[in-house]
Amino acid sequence: MENVLEYLEASAVSFSDKIAAKDDKESCTYRELATDARRAGGILTNYTEIRKPVAVFMEKGVVTLKTFMGILYAGCFYTLVDPTFPVDRIQQILSILQTDVVVTLDEYKDKLLESGYSGQIICAEMLWNDQTGEPNQENRLEKIRQKINDTDPVYCNFTSGSTGIPKGVLICHRSIIDFIGHFTDIFHITSEDVIGNQAPFDFDVSVKDIYSALKTGATLVMIPRSFFMFPNAVVDMLDENKVTTMIWAVSALCLLNRLHGLKYKVPAHVNKILFSGEMMPIKQLNIWRSYYPDAMFVNLYGPTEITCNCTYYILDRTFTEDDRLPAGIAFPNERVFLLGEEDQEISADMPGTTGEICVAGTALALGYYNNPQATRKAFTWNPLQTGYPEMIYRTGDLAFYGEDGLLYFAGRKDFQIKHMGHRIELEEIESVLSGVSIVEHACCFFDEKRSKIVAFYVGEDDKKQIVEEMKQKVPEYMVPNIF
């Protein structure tokens, strides 16, 4: 297998009339998804060239998934740009991408124009509702497929950058195919599953949802972001759609607990709960396990740069609040190891010794799009391998081996944090906060116990104005919780 579209094409044959994807407004079968994606790909070839980025400016949904697949048929790669982001953030991402075309919906067009984008804008529905067609479209798509290989990019997801400029992580076909193959096998995801998607499509947790469904013929149910303000709506959607598999951010699971969602109703068909993004509080974990004593619970770890996750731990015992949850063991075909301050290897027979988590293997990202300097810093040659050049990713995360031989997360090497499932550079928050008109100087730290970003600043005492100005430049999850 060389192209993730082979997942879609195989499922369109084996499960043609089965629901492939569903949101709160519409659904589509695997046949419809494949047909509309090919039609979209043919149209997109008129607007851009292969191996170029196409920005998708919309919230997640069936339309979004069709657009993603259409972009891949055109031989390009996609980037989801969240329309709720501040205009400044949108400008930064589009400036890095330098895309020829943005696919959006009419409702988001004004926001896109406000960002200053002056390239081609296409309304998503016209990509497959245009009935004119072209007689040579299939030939053109076939020629494109022959030119694309497994190291060409599929998507570019943006993460926080220490300079205040986001970094676009570029992931290729081979990395996804390698990871998803092991992921679905280990956790027994099959065509019988219904995957309840929580994560936004610019967040790599969603990659597991999308491609696990496409590979196995499972049904993907996309829960709108707005539903999470009303936990009963989330729980009802899980229950009514008979969701079996939840691959969620820790913050979302905790939110549903805090809002007493499971006290209202326990979705009856859930049997797999996989979580990642930050450390799962044992208290919150045990609440979920009390409602689902027979379900599989899995702790996943890994940054965006290694294609979703590099380690996993299937919970096989009870945990008290004094226990530490293991990050676990490496996925097959990924080598996860620790390096000390002098680049010496810290092995499993040195329990308790902390080192930086490093990763080697097929799942490594291609690098940061249009950012060779950041790429060279994070993706380096393995200092332990002197016989030939081996690329590794230095995560900046610290860990140690326990007496049980498992890895345990031990914090960050730098000023990067995980908050609400997102990887954030505190330096970027400080940079934006210091740029607020009434702030002279600022610094931030992350209160891990309360999972809150705390800011100290010199300036005028007007928290409301500070928050309003920051929201114009960064997503809400990057605005400090305490001033």
Question: What kind of feature is each model-predicted range?
Answer:
Residues 1-156, 171-172, 178, 281-286, ...:
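AMP-binding/adenylate-forming domain of the ANL superfamily
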Residues 58-62, 76-94, 106-109, 218-240, ...:
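ATP-dependent adenylate-forming carboxylate-activation enzymes
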